[in-house]
Every structure is written in structure tokens, then in C-alpha cells.
Regions:
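Acidic/aromatic-lined carbohydrate-recognition and catalytic surfaces
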Residues: 1-171
């Protein structure tokens, strides 16, 4: 789940979405969405044994935006099918994240009233206005789940089961 400020898995934006922090950048290099030199050109924090989430967030999202521009030039054949299959949660999640960005990262209850109240006209206008940003968040989930399913298949072949936890404090 994508985490909120404080980076706690129990303070997330979705119970369904995968955390973009776990998208493997080397994998994106192999897919020609990023270049190794681009990944190496960004700061990742001063200490190898400590995660600086602020620095990581800034660098990672800049790189993911670069990957997105390349992704748009040749969307994979299965991308649209993924978006349709996961539409029950992905459509609203991607819209929410795009609106959160458009509102400076502020909480939804501080947004324009018609958006807060999910008025159909306001949501339709937002979907049109922020279509590219929505696509970015859909791409992040596509990449996350593509990698997740490959990892899960690999470890399951080795007789390893993965267990996890569900974020229940979504607000």
C-alpha cells in the first residue's frame, strides 16, 4: 500500500494499491523505461544503512515520471486489460492520487466542496483535466503488480509462501 506522511504501512492511501517504493528500478532499466545512469544521478540519502524517505520519495518519483514519459510512447499490450480488470479500485485510487497532487498534497477534506462531496460533474471534469496524472498512477500500479506477480510466481515455484498484512487504517 502506498504510505502517507510518516511512511507507516498503517497510514496508507489505499488497501488495494501497491507501494511504488517497491517498484524495482533495475527492472525498469531492463524494460528500457529508465537508464542506469539516470538512476545513479539521483541522491538516495547519505547513509547506506538508513532510509531517508524524503530523499527517496523525491528521487524515486522524478525517475518514475521519466519512466512514465517513455511508457506512454509504447504502452504494453496488457496495460489496458490491467486497468479494466482492476477498475473497481484503480480508477478511484488513481483519480484520488492525481487530485491529491493537484491540491498540493493536502488532505481531501480541504479540497473544493464538489470534489469532497464526489459530485459526478466535478469528478468527470477532474478525470478530464488530470487524465495524464491519472494514467501515471495507473502505470505505477501496473508496474508494481507486474513485478509482484513475477516475484510471487518465482518464490512459489521454490516452495516459499508469502504472507502479509492488510492496512486497515485507510481514511
Amino acid at each position: 500500500c502506498p504510505t502517507s506522511y510518516g511512511d507507516s504501512p498503517y497510514q496508507s492511501f489505499s488497501s488495494f494499491a501497491g507501494n511504488p517504493y517497491f517498484i524495482d528500478l533495475e527492472y525498469l532499466c531492463k524494460e528500457k523505461l529508465l537508464k542506469k545512469a539516470e538512476c545513479e544521478s539521483f541522491p538516495w540519502g547519505k547513509k547506506a544503512d538508513k532510509v531517508d524517505y524524503g530523499v527517496m520519495y523525491e528521487s524515486r518519483y522524478k525517475l518514475l515520471k521519466i519512466a512514465f514519459e517513455r511508457f506512454l510512447r509504447a504502452e504494453p499490450d496488457d496495460f489496458e486489460a490491467f486497468c479494466e480488470k482492476e477498475a473497481d479500485w484503480l480508477s478511484d485510487y488513481a483519480l484520488f492520487m492525481a487530485l491529491k497532487d493537484a491540491n498540493g498534497g493536502n488532505a481531501w477534506f480541504s479540497w473544493e466542496k464538489d470534489l469532497k462531496m464526489r459530485k459526478p460533474e466535478a469528478l468527470a471534469e477532474a478525470r478530464s483535466t488530470y487524465a495524464k496524472d491519472i494514467r501515471f498512477y495507473q502505470m505505477l500500479q501496473y508496474l508494481f503488480f507486474k513485478q509482484w506477480w513475477e516475484l510471487k510466481a518465482y518464490v512459489n515455484e521454490k516452495g516459499i509462501e508469502i504472507i502479509g498484512d492488510v492496512p486497515i487504517y485507510v481514511a
